Amino acid sequence: MNIQKVWDAFIKENDNTSFVEMANAVVEQLGGVDEDTILNSLYSCRNANDGYTGFCYFSETSKFWNENKSVIIENMHELADDFGEDLITMIKGFNNFKDDEDITYDAIGKALYAPFDENESRYIYDTFAKYALEEVANRFQYWWYEQDESEFDD
């Protein structure tokens, strides 16, 4: 199977520029376009907390967030709009945050819009980075399920 052909076809299906940027950043963080990344990591990802290469440690996820903040925020805004919610309310509803009294609306807003501060917001940054991984993985899984694998043979 030609994995680059698989990835290129998936990207071509997604005409949303910010999603494409986020997807490419996620795949790069996972290790690049190869069979392990695409078929094992993206296809099998159900929960980003399960420990995927590049998304295990706060230092990795905070750096990923800082480098890709604008495209992740843009994608989160689009999802919030789809849900008919404002961005911060949607984020507060994430499983990691909804029952955590320490994660306030103000803390989320600060993590989104204040200057990067890994020490103060690392847990929130970690969740934002893992949101990106799960969003890309979910879209890839849905797309891959509809594909005829023989189209991607060498």
Indicate residue ranges for each PLM-predicted region.
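Acidic, low-complexity, intrinsically disordered interaction modules
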Residues: 25-152
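N-terminal targeting leader peptides, primarily classical Sec-type signal peptides for secretion
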Residues: 6, 152-154
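Short, extreme N-terminal segment that most often corresponds to the first beta-strand
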Residues: 1-21, 145-146
